[in-house]
Regions:
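Membrane-embedded alpha-helical bundles of multi-pass integral membrane proteins
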Residues: 1-244
């Protein structure tokens, strides 16, 4: 019985990766219908341009406010996804914070770094949503931006907001269980952002905290799998296709 969550997680992971691969193969098939182009020339120039635009987000910084917000969300999401390595390891093996014993104090730094970026992403997403739906900047209310483009953009923002919120909620319940010296929750990590939420959960029983921590953990990783496969249907697929 103790292995059931591991089995369920592994099945979920395999299905998510399979479905993503299936969609990517469809996309590849459609791309290959086009005429082949030789792009082996100017390799250095092409690599520099890719790094500048895809990683450096040079096109976005032409507009200072939206540029900074884009960089925060983009860089933050890439950095945040590093924690997926540990979550996947924990999910398959049934461990908890599997990397903590090997990284020592550096692990505390990494988790605090993730939390700060999660907070910045939440702030940036709220500002993005307000600019699009409350302030209604001119470029967002053009006819071509109505319908699916608007809905898609908002869905991406909701995804990011919910994923980062679940990440912080997972951490705050985890840290409270660490404070209670629960044997299954290793004392590891530094939580500068989620610790602000401790008063909300501090009155709950140990059993309730364990249930909530597991709910938030499963919601976070399941949401990531759903988001990964939603990208195929979104204009934000360029997040992946911006790289060679």
């Amino acid at each position: 019985i103790t292995y059931i969550p591991n089995i369920i997680f592994t099945i979920l992971l395999i299905f998510s990766v399979w479905f993503f691969r299936r969609n990517i193969l469809f996309l590849k098939r459609n791309i290959l219908l086009g005429r082949d182009i030789d792009r082996n020339d100017q390799k250095k120039k092409r690599w520099i341009k890719m790094l500048r635009i895809a990683i450096g987000q040079s096109k976005m910084v032409k507009k200072p406010v939206s540029g900074v917000l884009h960089i925060v969300v983009y860089a933050g999401f890439i950095i945040m996804n590093i924690e997926l390595l540990e979550i996947i390891t924990d999910g398959i093996l049934g461990t908890h914070r599997a990397f903590a014993p090997y990284l020592g104090n550096f692990y505390n730094f990494i988790i605090s770094f993730f939390e700060i970026f999660a907070g910045l992403i939440i702030l940036a997403v709220i500002l993005f949503w307000a600019r699009r739906n409350i302030i209604k900047l001119k470029r967002f209310i053009k006819p071509e931006m109505e319908g699916w483009p608007k809905k898609d953009a908002n869905l991406i923002l909701y995804f990011e907001l919910v994923l980062m919120t679940f990440f912080l909620l997972m951490n705050v319940t985890d840290s409270l269980l660490q404070d209670a010296n629960h044997p299954q929750y290793l004392k590891a990590g530094s939580f500068p952002i989620s610790s602000l939420l401790k008063p909300v959960f501090s009155s709950l029983s140990i059993e309730s905290l364990i249930i909530l921590e597991r709910i938030f953990w499963w919601a976070h990783i399941t949401g990531i799998f759903i988001f990964l496969n939603y990208l195929y249907y979104s204009k934000h697929l360029h997040i992946i296709l911006a790289f060679p």
